[in-house]
Design a protein with these regions (language model features):
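General beta-strand structural signal in soluble alpha/beta enzymes
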Residues: 160-164, 187-192, 235, 258-261, ...
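Buried hydrophobic packing segments
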Residues: 104-108, 177, 213-221, 245, ...
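Rossmann-like adenosine-cofactor binding region
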Residues: 264-362, 367
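N-terminal ligand-binding/catalytic initiation module
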Residues: 1-203, 433-442
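Adenosine-phosphate binding glycine-rich loop
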Residues: 2-24, 220, 332-444
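Conserved active-site and cofactor/substrate-binding residues in soluble primary-metabolism enzymes
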Residues: 2, 16-23, 27, 43, ...
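Glycine-rich phosphate/diphosphate-binding loop of Rossmann-like nucleotide-binding domains
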Residues: 193-196, 201-310
Length: 444
């Protein structure tokens, strides 16, 4: 049995009931076979893959808080500090009922390679809780965040582990978490990113993942002699990533015609009105039915169906495993040219393989959605220097980072005989940097 297969079997055996984590490890290691086989004997001797796929530290804790009725509620909190070979742990916090240790480990493992690809000195980690902020009052959200940070603060710091937002954790939650950290530790430092502009946040952080997705996608299209101008684009999601991907796509001349939330989706053949979408989702915090009511050209459909729309480019920006094999078949039948992931692992392995087999350009999330964490690292830089850069300066650095990520991914794919396979290219480019750092630091 090969070393890769041994480690995959070990992960499945030692981490039962964690299918998302199994999927992430399998996808990465399968694509790294060609690299690992070159040094298999040495890697096996150093147990390099075992060290890579096991977190350095895994923290699980209870989070008690009091709701508006005076009832004590108890949730579970997690922080998985996966790999610090190239810098402090860096990765978001997710507050959602679906959160469990397997999902946090999958996200943390992916984060190692994503952070490595940015070229910035940040390691991989992830955290969160099964708390659902939806339907909670501001006071309840604050009570939960303060209790969560009371435990988490023991394990994080500006040079140790710097969490950020993710699903269910926006500016409000980051503010409450930062306030509690400062109160408990007596330190005003860049311990969290995604902060408000009045207390150490970075301009362009909100837009970063969506903008970065389009910078990467555009670089990929240009390398394949395709012009984004005039292309029809299907986008899923209606959160930060989707909204700002739509906005940047329009600025580059593309025509996004869809978006979605947890209850349904919008098809707007005239192109999504991004200002109306921001009003509905960011200001009024309403469902997409409100968008359709205010926009005569828009059609609202319940359930799922974004990928049934005929498009040139598909941007899954909602959640993991949302684009499945049947969706991939529909997209290919409708003539899709490129699929670029805005969310974390939104495409199943089967769907990814089908798209690639049918000549569709595929950008994996660890490369194409790295704009968010890259700009988080730029926020860390500003905090450590006590500086604040302009929007244009941050955006310009982001564009350069994303174009460099594509260039490195493209080069790694070509070097190992996988031209235009950006999944393999991203995994190889991210892996080689982390492994080099791990080897240099010894068996730790």
């Amino acid at each position: 049995m090969s070393y890769v297969d041994e480690v995959i079997d070990l992960i499945v055996k030692e981490n039962p009931d964690e299918p998302e984590f199994h999927q992430a490890v399998k996808e990465v290691l399968e694509s790294l076979r060609v690299v690992i086989e070159e040094n298999e004997e040495q890697y096996r001797k150093d147990a390099l893959l075992e060290r890579l796929v096991n977190p350095e530290r895994q923290i699980k804790f209870r989070v008690p808080w009091v709701d508006d009725n005076g009832q004590v509620q108890v949730n579970t909190g997690y922080r998985v500090q996966f790999n610090s070979a190239i810098g402090p742990y860096k990765g978001g916090l997710r507050f959602h009922p679906s959160v469990n240790v397997g999902i946090i480990k999958f996200l943390g493992f992916e984060q190692i390679f994503k952070n490595s690809l940015t070229g910035l000195p940040i390691g991989g980690g992830k955290g969160g809780s099964n708390f659902d902020p939806k339907g909670k009052s501001d006071r309840e959200v604050m009570a939960f965040c303060q209790s969560f940070m009371t435990e988490l603060c023991k394990y994080i710091g500006a040079d140790t582990d710097v969490p950020a937002g993710d699903i269910g954790v926006g500016g409000r939650e980051i503010g409450y978490l930062f306030g509690q950290y400062k109160r408990l530790q007596g330190l005003y430092e860049g311990v969290l990113t995604g902060k408000g502009l009045t207390f150490g946040g970075s301009l362009a952080r909100t837009e970063a993942t969506g903008y970065g997705l389009l910078y990467f996608t555009n670089a990929m299209l240009k390398a394949n002699d395709i012009d984004i101008a005039g292309k029809t684009i299907a986008v899923s999601g209606a959160g930060n990533v989707a909204i700002y991907a739509i906005q940047k796509a329009q600025q580059l001349g593309g025509k996004p015609v869809t978006c979605s939330d947890s209850t349904g989706w919008i098809y707007d053949p005239e192109g999504i009105d991004v200002e109306l979408l921001k009003e509905v989702k960011e200001v009024r915090r309403e469902r997409l039915t409100a968008y359709a009511e205010a926009r005569p050209s828009a059609e609202y459909h319940e359930g799922k169906g974004v990928w049934t729309v005929k498009c040139d480019i598909a941007l899954p920006c909602a959640t993991q495993n949302e684009l499945q094999l049947e969706d991939a078949k529909t997209l290919v039948a409708n003539g899709v040219t490129a699929v670029a992931e805005g969310a974390n692992m939104p495409t199943t392995i089967e769907a990814t393989e089908y798209l690639q087999e049918n000549g569709v350009l595929f950008a994996p999330g660890k490369a194409s959605n790295a704009g968010g964490v890259a700009t988080s690292a730029l926020e860390m830089s500003q905090n450590s220097q006590r500086l604040s850069w302009t929007f244009e300066e941050v955006d310009s650095r982001l564009q350069t980072i994303m174009e460099n990520i594509f260039a490195n991914v493209d080069a790694a794919a070509k070097d190992y005989g996988f031209e235009k396979n950006y999944v393999v290219g991203a995994n190889i480019a991210g892996f080689l940097k982390v492994v080099d750092a791990m080897n240099a630091q010894g068996i730790v």
